[in-house]
């Protein structure tokens, strides 16, 4: 595309920096092809240490980057979009990582005489495990994004976890099943560890056993392609310890409670988007 940078980041807090590190580590782009716009000293220091170009001028970054990641909070994005609007052309991709901000609202904010209705916009929702390279990101794209664009975008987000393109209408569901659910999983790990501590295990060991078991079980689901119920059944011997524990969890309402939690988070996301 003839610009200085393949990738530009506006906003380099914890999430933005984690995404930037993942993309650099993947080897898809050299650090000389990456830029960041950051107005706060702490953020500037973080990205300068990575060896990428840093500016405080959002307009400059937008003008000189092929793909622009907006990793800022919604209220900050309202300020940033007008700053970059007149520096964009129709072959650039703008990726919004602001929670609850729709594609149409980004398009509206970027509307100008030169690029009216032609800007390529992506809405992204990564979750916090992206901070350790194990994120799950939902991506929704507008009508101007090509299949080739999708491949590029997916490759960047796969650098710090996994990514899927979904209809924007499912973004609230993504909030429930992916965005909010790390908190639910942490509660499950904590509860398992509490039980182990109650039975005599040290707290440090209990967290390690519980967390690694969750990680391994999740890997089994992803790598085997087996139904979670089938994997559960394979661990349950007739009259054994596991089926005894499963029955106790069923009696306690584990399934309906988890379902209620995911649906409550989904509904809250819908309510906040109105």
Task: Report the location of each language-model feature.
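NAD(P)+-binding Rossmann beta1-loop-alpha1 motif at the extreme N-terminus of oxidoreductases
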Residues: 1-56, 60-63, 197-199
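Short pre-catalytic strand/loop immediately N-terminal to key active-site residues, enriched for Gly-Thr
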Residues: 122, 171-176, 228-233
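Small-residue helix-packing motif on alpha-helices
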Residues: 34, 61, 77, 202-210, ...
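Hydrophobic residues within alpha-helices
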Residues: 19-20, 84, 192
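Rossmann-like NAD(P)(H) cofactor-binding subdomain of soluble oxidoreductases
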Residues: 50, 58-70, 74-139
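NAD(P)-dependent Rossmann-like dehydrogenase/reductase catalytic/cofactor-binding core
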Residues: 2, 211-274
């Amino acid at each position: 595309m003839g610009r200085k940078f393949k990738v530009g980041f506006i906003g380099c807090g914890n999430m933005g920096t984690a995404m930037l590190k993942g993309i650099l580590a993947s080897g898809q782009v050299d650090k000389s092809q990456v830029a960041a716009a950051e107005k706060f000293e702490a953020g500037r220091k973080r990205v300068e240490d990575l060896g990428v170009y840093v500016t405080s001028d959002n307009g400059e970054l937008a003008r000189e980057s092929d793909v622009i990641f907006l990793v800022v909070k919604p209220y900050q994005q309202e300020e940033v979009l007008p700053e970059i609007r007149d520096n964009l052309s129709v072959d650039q991709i703008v990726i919004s990582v602001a929670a609850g901000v729709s594609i149409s609202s980004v398009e509206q904010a970027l509307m100008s005489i030169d690029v009216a209705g032609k800007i390529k916009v992506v809405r992204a929702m990564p979750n916090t495990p992206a901070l350790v390279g194990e994120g799950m990101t939902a991506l929704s794209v507008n009508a101007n994004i090509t299949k080739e664009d999708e491949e590029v975008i997916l490759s960047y987000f796969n650098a710090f976890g996994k990514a899927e393109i979904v209809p924007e209408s499912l973004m609230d569901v993504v909030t429930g099943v992916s965005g909010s659910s790390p908190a639910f999983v942490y509660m499950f790990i904590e509860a398992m560890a509490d039980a182990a501590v109650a039975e005599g295990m040290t707290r440090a060991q209990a967290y390690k056993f519980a967390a690694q078991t969750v990680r391994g079980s999740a890997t089994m689901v992803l790598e085997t392609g087996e139904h979670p119920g089938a994997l559960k059944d394979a661990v349950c011997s007739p009259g054994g310890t596991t089926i005894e524990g499963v029955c106790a969890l069923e009696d306690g309402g584990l399934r309906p409670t988890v379902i209620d939690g995911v649906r409550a988070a989904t509904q809250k996301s819908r309510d906040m988007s109105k």
